[in-house]
Structure formats: structure tokens, C-alpha cells
Regions:
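Conserved catalytic cores of phosphodiester-cleaving nucleases, focusing on short active-site segments
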Residues: 42, 88-103, 116-118
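Structural motif
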Residues: 31-38, 108, 169-176
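Short, charged, amphipathic alpha-helix that recurs within catalytic cores of restriction-modification
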Residues: 109-121
Length: 189
């Protein structure tokens, strides 16, 4: 698949440069919500994940997040799969809901929910709003997909594929968030 990426990236860029309002078919993207989220956290993490180096399953933080997800909002239908790529935690009152452990990475959470809304809209679902649920903190954040954010999502999709197509992983971030990352041992050993 990586061999066809330069053509795909060029086609996406051409569409943007011509400022055409043509939706990108979701089925051609095959970018997961996790990839979209990782782009806003760490490009190295995104690259490693895209190259099947997945260390998060051993992370205590991921385990705790999964427990919170499983036991919060028990009345809601959980994990709605779209094309085997996108997993939405639940839909309620016409809004996409995403359950997160904490708001420490809220920007990435916001963009992940916006991406889910974008994907649903590409499939013909009339939805513009989302909610990020932080049950441990007993709070929510409302999210709305605007035309400007939709354009940013398209730009981000291009950038994600560029990061993933690179021959080598990006440099180590060297940030305080690295200490809680499932990839910390890989990056710093």
C-alpha cells in the first residue's frame, strides 16, 4: 500500500489546491481513529503504530482507559464499527461520543471525534456534533465539525500519510508525555 501513497497524496493535495468541495471517500482513507489521535500526540508514535510496532497493549494507562471505557455508560450501545476501521464508543442524541480516561491530551481527543464525525458525514450521516466524556473527571467537552475544521481534517489526513510513508521514524519527542507512553521503552532504550 505504501507504494501507492505518493500518487494518493498528490491527488489529495491537488484537490485542496484547486479548492474543490469534493468529499474524499472514507473507504479510500483507511485511517483509524487511533492514527488520527496519535498524529496530534507524537508523530513517532504514529509511525511506529502504522508499521505494526504496537506496544500500547502492555501499558497500564491503556489498560485503565479500557476499564473506564467498558464500565462507563452501561446503557449505551458500545463500539460502533464503521468499515472495520473506525470504532465509535457510542452515539447518543445525534452526537458521537468518545470516552477518555483524562483530558490531558484533549486536543488529540477533539480531533479524533471531529474525524469520526467527518467519516460519518462522508457516509451520508447527517451529524455535526460530538461529545468527549471524561467519566473519571465527571465532565464532558462538546465538539462541532465546522467547514474550517473539515478542511483541517483533510490536510491532516495528507500529513498522516506522509508521516507513515517516511522510511524512518521521526525523532524522539523528548517531552514529559513520553514518561506515560507505551512506547517509552522502545524510544529510550
Amino acid at each position: 500500500m505504501l507504494k501507492t501513497l505518493p500518487f494518493f497524496l498528490k491527488a489529495l493535495k491537488d484537490l485542496l489546491l484547486r479548492n474543490m468541495n469534493i468529499p474524499i471517500p472514507f473507504s479510500h482513507l483507511q485511517i483509524t481513529g487511533t492514527e488520527f489521535n496519535y498524529f496530534f500526540i507524537c508523530h513517532r508514535k504514529l509511525w511506529l503504530f502504522a508499521h505494526d510496532i504496537q506496544m500500547e497493549q502492555e501499558s497500564d494507562n491503556v489498560y485503565l482507559g479500557n476499564l473506564i471505557h467498558e464500565h462507563s455508560y452501561p446503557r449505551e450501545k458500545k463500539e460502533i464499527m464503521i468499515d472495520g476501521v473506525i470504532r465509535i464508543d457510542f452515539l447518543d442524541d445525534g452526537a458521537v461520543h468518545e470516552v477518555k480516561k483524562s483530558d490531558k491530551m484533549e486536543e488529540s481527543h477533539i480531533w479524533q471525534v471531529l474525524y469520526y464525525i467527518y467519516c460519518l458525514r462522508q457516509k451520508g450521516v447527517d451529524i455535526r456534533n460530538g461529545v468527549i466524556n471524561y467519566p473519571k473527571q465527571k465532565r464532558t467537552t462538546d465538539v462541532e465539525l465546522t467547514p474550517e475544521k473539515e478542511t483541517e481534517i483533510i490536510n491532516t489526513l495528507i500529513k498522516i500519510r506522509e508521516v507513515e510513508a517516511a522510511p524512518h521514524p521521526p525523532a524522539v519527542l523528548g517531552s514529559k508525555i513520553c514518561k506515560k507512553c507505551g512506547y517509552e521503552d522502545f524510544c529510550y532504550s
